[in-house]
Regions:
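A short, conserved structural fragment
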Residues: 75-86
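Hydrophobic residues on short alpha-helical segments
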Residues: 43-44
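Short, amphipathic alpha-helical interaction segments positioned at domain boundaries
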Residues: 88-125
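Short acidic, hydrophobic short linear motifs in intrinsically disordered regions
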Residues: 48-60
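Catalytic cores of enzyme domains
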Residues: 125-217
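Long, low-complexity, charged/polar intrinsically disordered regions in eukaryotic proteins
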Residues: 1-28
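Short amphipathic alpha-helical interaction segments
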Residues: 60-76
């Protein structure tokens, strides 16, 4: 019988950026740090598209109240993304990167950081290069194409920020991880922005704080 964590690894490998296996099984160690077996079982049945707990419960033939509590717990642990709209809440499964790993801010310890660094250096960092279908590839169309992609000036970035209703800033998860394994750098750490519902998620999970438009500038 296939181990639940092997099934979870395979599921994550089907999502964005993959989650490849290694001989050392460091990827399984990471999953055991992140998920209980019960959480892994539920994650396997969730969609990467936002769903209401009532819809998930109906699809899985489970009690709404019990399932809602588990979905919320998994969102707090960074397994799922949570989006609120008034009294309505929806959840979706997220990949390891970008997703579960970034959501470990405030939760990761040295052991997790060392396992992640080992995994990134030996396998995960090579996933894009190992895809059977290249991420970037040339497709001949036998006709001239006009490319007009201007580089956005600084003023455009300011305009994007000014148009946001909710902005959060959080520590850089990469620099946080490096610090835990003894490779702290001298660059600022609190410099990652999130906007809208993602800003709400970061603040609600204790990973970041809301800032004003002027502070973001």
């Amino acid at each position: 019988m296939t181990d639940i964590y092997e099934k979870l690894r395979a599921r994550l490998d089907d999502l964005a950026n993959g989650y490849p296996a290694t001989e050392s099984k460091v990827e399984i160690r990471l999953l055991k740090r992140l998920f209980t077996e019960e959480e892994a079982e539920l994650y396997l049945q969730l969609s990467p598209f936002l769903e209401k707990p009532q819809d998930v419960a109906k699809r899985l033939n489970r009690e709404v109240e019990e399932l809602s509590a588990m979905l919320e717990r998994m969102a707090q642990k960074g397994h799922l993304f949570r989006k609120r709209n008034g009294d309505q809440v929806r959840y979706s499964a997220v990949p390891y990167v970008v997703g579960i790993f970034e959501h470990q801010l405030g939760r990761m310890d040295e052991g997790f950081a060392r396992d992640h660094e080992e995994y990134f250096e030996t396998a995960f960092g090579q996933t894009i290069q190992s895809f059977k279908t290249p991420v970037l590839r040339t497709i001949p169309v036998n006709r001239q194409m006009v490319a007009d992609y201007p580089v956005a000036p600084f003023e455009d970035v300011l305009q994007i920020i000014e148009n946001q209703k909710k902005i959060a800033v959080a520590p850089c998860v990469c620099r946080t991880t490096k610090k835990l394994v003894g490779h702290e750098c001298d660059k600022p750490v609190e410099n990652c922005f999130s906007f809208g519902s993602h800003a709400e998620y970061y603040v609600e999970n204790g990973m970041g704080r809301f800032i004003t438009i002027d502070e973001a500038k």
